[in-house]
């Protein structure tokens, strides 16, 4: 325990909170350009080929972002919108690409949870 005098000389430092998505810089989303589109394999108990893209953001950051949904139309130089949100079984992937925004098309033939995948309401 420090004395009162010690606390006056050198006050306590407040702990700084680390952000989960630093590249967004407190913005809800960021625009970026795909520099590489690839598949990666997940961590130990899981097995798949997860679709990810390396994205150069408008603020200069370069991040790896997950492409959600079945099938996508992304390639190099595609303009995408990035939101926060990590993928638990892919180390280093801390961002998601927003489907249905910019050059990214929505998921085809999606009936449920359409808003998360940028799919329009099907004609009845």
UniProtKB/Swiss-Prot annotation:
Keywords: Methylation, Ribonucleoprotein, Ribosomal protein, RNA-binding, rRNA-binding, tRNA-binding. The keyword Metal-binding does not apply. One of its GO terms (biological process) is translation. Transmembrane segments: none annotated. The modification 3-methylthioaspartic acid is found at residue 89. GO terms for molecular function: rRNA binding; structural constituent of ribosome; tRNA binding. Residues 17-27 have a biased composition (Polar residues). Residues 1-27 are annotated as: Disordered. It comes from the Bacteria. Gene3D superfamilies: Nucleic acid-binding proteins. SUPFAM superfamilies: Nucleic acid-binding proteins (SSF50249). InterPro entries: NA-bd_OB-fold (IPR012340), Ribosomal_uS12 (IPR006032), Ribosomal_uS12_bac (IPR005679). One of its GO terms (cellular component) is small ribosomal subunit. Belongs to the universal ribosomal protein uS12 family. PANTHER family: 30S RIBOSOMAL PROTEIN S12 FAMILY MEMBER (PTHR11652). With S4 and S5 plays an important role in translational accuracy. Part of the 30S ribosomal subunit. Contacts proteins S8 and S17. May interact with IF1 in the 30S initiation complex. This is Small ribosomal subunit protein uS12. It comes from Borreliella burgdorferi (strain ATCC 35210 / DSM 4680 / CIP 102532 / B31) (Borrelia burgdorferi).
């Amino acid at each position: 325990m420090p004395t009162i005098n010690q606390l006056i000389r050198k006050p306590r430092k407040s702990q700084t909170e680390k952000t989960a998505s630093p590249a967004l810089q407190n913005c809800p989303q960021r625009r970026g350009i795909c520099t590489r589109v690839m598949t990666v394999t997940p961590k130990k108990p899981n097995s798949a080929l997860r679709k990810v893209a390396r994205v150069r953001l408008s603020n200069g950051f370069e991040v790896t972002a997950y492409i959600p949904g079945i099938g996508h139309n992304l390639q190099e130089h595609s303009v995408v919108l990035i939101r926060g949100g990590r993928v638990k079984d892919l180390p280093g992937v801390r961002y998601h690409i927003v489907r249905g925004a910019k050059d990214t098309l929505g998921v085809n033939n999606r009936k449920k949870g359409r808003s998360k995948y940028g799919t329009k309401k099907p004609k009845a």
